[in-house]
A protein has these predicted regions:
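Residue-level marker for buried hydrophobic side chains located in beta-strands
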Residues: 55, 95-96
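Generic structural "secondary-structure junction" signal
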Residues: 24, 28, 105, 116, ...
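Conserved phosphate/anionic-ligand binding catalytic regions in large, soluble enzymes, centered on
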Residues: 24, 96-111
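Acidic, glycine-enriched catalytic cores built around paired aspartates
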Residues: 58-61, 69-79, 83, 91, ...
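Core mixed alpha/beta domains of very large multi-subunit molecular machines
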Residues: 1-25, 29-46, 51, 57-91
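Acidic, His- and aromatic-enriched active-site or binding-groove loops in soluble protein domains
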Residues: 14-16, 40-49, 114-132
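Short, solvent-exposed polar/charged micro-motifs at secondary-structure junctions
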Residues: 1-2, 29-31, 104-107, 347-355
Length: 402
């Protein structure tokens, strides 16, 4: 923050741009309040901001680093702490949410997302990003655009005037316990399994996504490297294409299951009924699980690899997906996903028959492209365009893809 202010001063900028710090990784989110407190304690900085400050909360890298549940809880706590620090220093804080379309990147229905923020964190103003794949759906037509702007305005006013209740101490304690277990399970698979990166690059179109003319940044931060080098959008996009949806549920289902097994379902039920944050978290998890399909993921795997180590890992991931679905149904006392959201359920049932042939076609195109490149030195293949069309078609059908 100070370096950017100094740069503008040295460059002789007469009307300096405001500097908005971004807190995104798990470590940065945990230290956000301390960082801002240090800045606010500087007398000249307090004078410079004139009682107003904007802070950006990032969603992508924290979810890729620690999993959906752990990242979500870290973002919630960071907002609470930032709000308290700003209030202590008499600063009007505006939180800038760098959300994406997928739940791993903070995606959720606008009204639900705003109501699930910590009490007091929305004080008459909010700033959000709308990702590329969502802009056309939300603002492509004048009437729909007006409706979405009205939703933003109404939700901001309601969250300001009628903030949600403070979470109880026992709810916080349970969330801390679940997120600790969630991040452990998530990292055991993503970071510690020696076959995970190879599985990602063999079974999903992670490498092929680099062909797509999408986004403002490259798919990777570095040409080579592991999960750390991959940007958050293609990370989510790749798993979505094969319908495994791994970033959203890995670790989360196991954490909830552990609490239920420990005879604490009554507390979870209370959280689900009385705490908007937890309601939204579970609703978004259910929505993503309803879009997952282990059989489609298995088809990609059987079509693209004969490696026994990868097949073992694939079986483990599909079993964990099944366990996550069963855990969610047990938590909500339901027999099927989306039983309390018939509109979304019907929407998915209508789209699924159109998605299936795209998945079958895509897996075959991926195999043909890789076989073609293995036999000759080339950058492009005859199936590149068809493969890109299949990727775009699946993304359009599933909506919140990256």
């Amino acid at each position: 923050v100070l370096a950017v202010l100094l740069l503008q001063k040295e460059a002789g900028i007469q009307h300096p741009l405001r500097v908005v710090p971004l807190f995104e990784t798990l470590k940065d989110l945990d230290g956000a309040a301390t960082t801002m407190n240090t800045l606010f304690n500087m007398h000249w900085y307090k004078q410079h901001i004139q009682g107003k400050h904007e802070v950006m909360i990032g969603y992508s890298d924290s979810a890729k680093d620690a999993g959906f549940m752990s990242a979500s809880w870290a973002q919630y706590r960071a907002q609470e702490e930032l709000t308290a620090i700003a209030r202590k220093h008499g600063v009007q804080l505006t939180l800038f949410h760098g959300r994406g379309g997928s739940i791993s990147r903070g995606g959720a229905p606008t009204q639900q997302a705003l109501f699930s923020q910590p009490p007091g964190s929305i004080s008459g103003a909010i700033r959000v990003t709308e990702q590329g794949e969502m802009i056309r759906f939300k603002f492509g037509l004048e009437g729909i655009a007006m409706q979405n702007l009205e939703i933003y305005t109404a939700a901001t006013l309601e969250a300001t005037l009628l903030p949600p209740p403070e979470p109880k101490a026992e709810w916080r304690e349970l969330m801390n316990r679940m997120t600790d277990h969630s991040v452990k399970v998530y990292r055991q698979t993503v970071r510690e399994n020696p076959h995970f990166v190879k599985y990602l690059r063999t079974v999903t179109p992670e490498l092929e996504l680099q062909m797509l003319p999408l986004g403002s940044r490259p798919a990777k931060r570095k040409v080579s490297g592991g999960i750390e080098s991959l940007r958050a959008i293609p990370w989510v996009f790749a798993w979505t294409q094969i319908r495994l949806m791994l970033p959203a549920w890995l670790g989360t289902g196991a954490a909830i299951n552990e609490v239920i097994a420990d005879q604490q379902k009554a507390t979870l039920d209370e959280m689900l009924q009385q705490w908007p944050y937890f309601q939204t978290l579970i609703d978004m998890l259910e929505m993503v699980l309803s879009k997952a399909d282990a059989n489609i993921a298995l088809y990609y795997e059987s079509h693209l690899t004969e490696d026994e180590d990868l097949k073992v890992l694939g079986n483990q991931l599909r079993q964990r997906l099944k366990d996550a679905v069963e855990t969610l149904l047990a938590l909500k006392d339901e027999s099927k996903l989306l039983s309390d959201n018939e509109v979304l359920d019907q929407s998915m049932q209508v789209r699924k028959p159109y998605l299936l042939p795209l998945h079958l076609l895509q897996a075959e195109l991926m195999k043909r492209r890789r076989d073609y490149l293995a036999e000759r030195q080339a950058e492009h293949t005859p199936v590149d365009h068809a493969l890109m069309v299949s990727i775009a078609g699946i993304a359009a059908g599933l909506r919140n893809t990256g």
